[in-house]
């Protein structure tokens, strides 16, 4: 099979928020020792979670699973005000690994509600980021998942309305929902800057750039990763078969039969070591060479909590 090629999307994999969240857990373990409790998977990637668990992190879904006097870390997806209050009441030592770009949305929600506006949250029901963002206020916030949902929205005052979005949505889907909102509520207020984060946008753009040149696309990421699922959808919407795989073992050789150009990308919570393993497996199956595609360089970094900045 001559001239087979593996196309590597750029950028791909870890974003600044994920790197920060993982480092918070690792530094807390170094500084305070195991166990360190983490509310929800710190990022949605099985490999990362299993690795941190092996180092002494204990993942829980609710704070009542954390013994009094222990340390708890909030995941990158953010938490509601009720969770913060519960941690405070319990006297737990808290490190907040919420992505700063999610925190930005939390601040927007609080500010808009203080101005007396009702809010529309564009996002996926049940996703922890959505639950955390909607839980910034006690009432006056509605969830919309599709443009069709907009028609059923019941609001008190159409002129006192604002919207925010989950940070990991499909850029195109979110734009369609915003268009529907503006058509129905012309005076709706949006965020000064789009809530969909730079990493989500860049990774989706990289897949759009890659798909015209690819016969099949592999997205390295876990099934519960919102941004990874969106990358798969972006490829599929452009008529290219796409598969979400946790690792190299998830690849079915039948998927690349007759495919000369194989695209590879990774979600924002997928480590590069898994991408490397996927590439090696694809090379072994297809005899393909690897070509790195051009993309937007990312130089974003987020500071760690002060108490953990010195921990090594």
UniProtKB/Swiss-Prot annotation:
Enzyme Commission number, as recorded: 1.17.7.4
Record pathway: Isoprenoid biosynthesis; dimethylallyl diphosphate biosynthesis; dimethylallyl diphosphate from (2E)-4-hydroxy-3-methylbutenyl diphosphate: step 1/1; Isoprenoid biosynthesis; isopentenyl diphosphate biosynthesis via DXP pathway; isopentenyl diphosphate from 1-deoxy-D-xylulose 5-phosphate: step 6/6
Residues binding (2E)-4-hydroxy-3-methylbut-2-enyl diphosphate: 44, 77, 127, 167, 225-227, 269
Cofactor annotation: [4Fe-4S] cluster
Molecular-function GO term, any one: 4-hydroxy-3-methylbut-2-enyl diphosphate reductase activity
One Pfam entry name: LYTB
Binding site for [4Fe-4S] cluster: 15, 99, 197
GO-annotated biological processes: dimethylallyl diphosphate biosynthetic process; isopentenyl diphosphate biosynthetic process, methylerythritol 4-phosphate pathway; terpenoid biosynthetic process
Presence of the UniProt keyword Iron-sulfur in the record: yes
Reaction catalyzed: isopentenyl diphosphate + 2 oxidized [2Fe-2S]-[ferredoxin] + H2O = (2E)-4-hydroxy-3-methylbut-2-enyl diphosphate + 2 reduced [2Fe-2S]-[ferredoxin] + 2 H(+); dimethylallyl diphosphate + 2 oxidized [2Fe-2S]-[ferredoxin] + H2O = (2E)-4-hydroxy-3-methylbut-2-enyl diphosphate + 2 reduced [2Fe-2S]-[ferredoxin] + 2 H(+)
Active-site residues annotated for this sequence: 129
EC class of the enzyme, as a word: oxidoreductase
InterPro entries tied to this protein: LytB/IspH (IPR003451)
Binding residues for isopentenyl diphosphate: 44, 77, 127, 225-227, 269
Keyword terms, alphabetized: 4Fe-4S, Iron, Iron-sulfur, Isoprene biosynthesis, Metal-binding, Oxidoreductase
Cofactor comment: Binds 1 [4Fe-4S] cluster per subunit.
Binding site for dimethylallyl diphosphate: 44, 77, 127, 225-227, 269
HAMAP family referenced in this protein's UniProt entry, alphabetically: IspH
NCBIfam families, per database record: ispH_lytB, PRK01045.1-2, PRK01045.1-4
Function: Catalyzes the conversion of 1-hydroxy-2-methyl-2-(E)-butenyl 4-diphosphate (HMBPP) into a mixture of isopentenyl diphosphate (IPP) and dimethylallyl diphosphate (DMAPP). Acts in the terminal step of the DOXP/MEP pathway for isoprenoid precursor biosynthesis.
Name this protein carries in UniProt: 4-hydroxy-3-methylbut-2-enyl diphosphate reductase
Lineage, highest ranks first: Bacteria, Pseudomonadati, Pseudomonadota, Betaproteobacteria, Rhodocyclales
